[in-house]
Amino acid sequence: MNHLQQEQKPMPSLFDRAIILAAQAHAGMRRKGSDTPYIVHPMEAAAIAATMTNDPEILAAAVLHDVVEDTFVTLDEIRQAFGDRVADIVSSESEDKREDRPSADTWLERKQETVDHLSRSTDEAVKIVALADKLSNIRAMHRDVLDIGDALWARFNQKDKAMHAWYYRAVGQALE
């Protein structure tokens, strides 16, 4: 009998369940201006977080960090399925999209709120997930700028690369 034929299978871990939900929630989504499946980003963020901690709640939050902001999944559903701590970390990574205004008009406001929140936070879990998320984003931008150059910036709500540089420097300072 091989491992696939075993009668009793262990219950999926918290992290396994987070991967399943994130994959379902992000199904069919792609990274901005790319053919890369979106799930690659939260999986990379979780892999980065795993270099800093083996805490299953932090790793679950890392893989789930965009589901509330970008999909149909609600924070209450995260809380019910994964508990308060995971939900609180995911909430800390979720921007208020301000659906009543164009995203380009609220970019600076949203990013400043993120920087302010990270500056005030004393929760190491929040900082680990934020760092993992931002590092994954920076890596993707680096790969893409090597491929398409400054055309990269056209895909974002904020078209000015200097503003992106400000944001990631400010996040870095907030995480110190």
How should these model regions be labeled?
Residues 2-176:
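Active-site helical microenvironments for divalent-metal-assisted chemistry
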